[in-house]
UniProtKB/Swiss-Prot annotation:
The lineage of its organism: Bacteria, Bacillati, Bacillota, Bacilli, Lactobacillales. Its main location: cytoplasm. Carrier protein involved in the D-alanylation of lipoteichoic acid (LTA). The loading of thioester-linked D-alanine onto DltC is catalyzed by D-alanine--D-alanyl carrier protein ligase DltA. The DltC-carried D-alanyl group is further transferred to cell membrane phosphatidylglycerol (PG) by forming an ester bond, probably catalyzed by DltD. D-alanylation of LTA plays an important role in modulating the properties of the cell wall in Gram-positive bacteria, influencing the net charge of the cell wall. The keyword Ubl conjugation does not apply. The gene is dltC. HAMAP family: DltC. This is D-alanyl carrier protein.
Amino acid sequence: MKEQIFDIIETVSGTDEFREDLDMDLFEEGILDSMRAIMLIVELEGAFDISLPPSEMDREDWNTANKIAARVQEKKDEN
């Protein structure tokens, strides 16, 4: 599942640069911005049949690929 999440991040961001360091801050590095973050949420929700309300997503809680993968897994486990 992690690999699928990383593929989605790559598609939305247009780069695989984050794969070199899965704890890289995607916002600080300019890989994600607010618009791409919303696009990422929509893609993840569709791919994994989960709900990721932006109001529950503080930037610090999902600013790295590893944190995004953990959050998606957490939401999948809730279902």
